[in-house]
Amino acid sequence: PYGCDVIVRRNQRSLAFILTRYSDQLAILNQVSIGAHPSYNDRENFGRVSLSLERDELMADLRYQICALKGMTESFGAVLHHVKPHGALYNDMVHDQDLAEDFIKLVKQIDPNLKIFTLANSSVIELCKKHNVQGVNEGFADRRYDLTIARWDHLRV
């Protein structure tokens, strides 16, 4: 029931690669599901800023990130369990159905058994269903929700 998201970037320096590998191995030792956490290649802001890229370029970069971790995980005898978009990509997918659909298709091409973690009750969950990919509703402990999993941060208690 526990998950660990690992970020892989193009041209990672050796220390970052070692940390990624260590995180992967630690998750395996502790029987924690491993997930890829791909994002825009925005090192300066750690993927928290939307980048205006050609869709093919973005999908190629996301494919690299997911496949790099998938290959590393499989080299340790484990399997990649899920994919969770990171930062601005996560938010952009909730508001841009074309982006979400391209992302879902990409994940399905890589491995149709991968689950996609996304905002609870969002349009991304519906698109996952449309493409026969398991979408996992996600909530955040530091946000307030009502019983429908709708955010209500705007209310003060």
Predicted features along the sequence, with ranges:
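Active-site beta-loop-alpha junctions enriched in small/polar residues
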Residues: 5-13, 39-45, 86-90, 119-121, ...
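Hydrophobic faces of well-ordered beta-strands that scaffold small-molecule active sites
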Residues: 2-4, 34-38, 81-85, 116-118, ...
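Active-site rim beta-loop-alpha module in soluble metabolic enzymes
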Residues: 121-157
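Glycine/small-residue-rich loop that forms an oxyanion/phosphate-binding "nest" at active or ligand-binding sites
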Residues: 44-85, 92
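Glycine-rich tight-turn/loop motif centered on a GG-T
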Residues: 2-10, 44-59, 94-96, 110, ...
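Acidic (Asp/Glu)-rich catalytic clusters
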Residues: 21-35, 74-77
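Glycine-rich anion/phosphate-binding loops
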Residues: 8-25, 53-68
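Hydrophobic, well-structured mid-protein blocks that either form specific transmembrane helices
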Residues: 75-123
